[in-house]
């Protein structure tokens, strides 16, 4: 069961284009806590034991499946760094939808740093979608720092070194980017 309030549901709709809980694999994070998770026969999601974040493992041969891992912050002053590793097996063709939204109505800055690593096996294809959204009428900043670290040598992984400072007062702001990741094998 997914535990989100109305503000968080609105943010999820912005960053993941979800208006209801998806049928496939997902991991929803809200204000630094797990808000809901579902795995499938082919996609497993586990909480990291040594630091904040998750491991997403996609079995070889998985086709036409997706995993959604949106993050929402609606508490002013919350700052977090999350480490997510994606292990994509051989001959996969999958979609990963990530992103973070911050609704900051307070005076303190709110920040989410998402560090992603992609381990993509031979002949695998990944469509990766990530959006950032900021809203709220508080004076606190909405800071999102997505970063990609290198994965296995099979994968060409473009770096996500953008910083999204979505600090526009009460006016919402949205940034997004899309990547098609292919193994080099």
Region roles according to the model:
Residues 24-30, 34-185:
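Conserved beta-strand/loop scaffold segments within soluble protein domains that form the structured core
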Residues 14-15, 57:
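Residues that form generic nucleotide/phosphate-binding pockets
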Residues 2-4, 16:
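C-terminal functional modules
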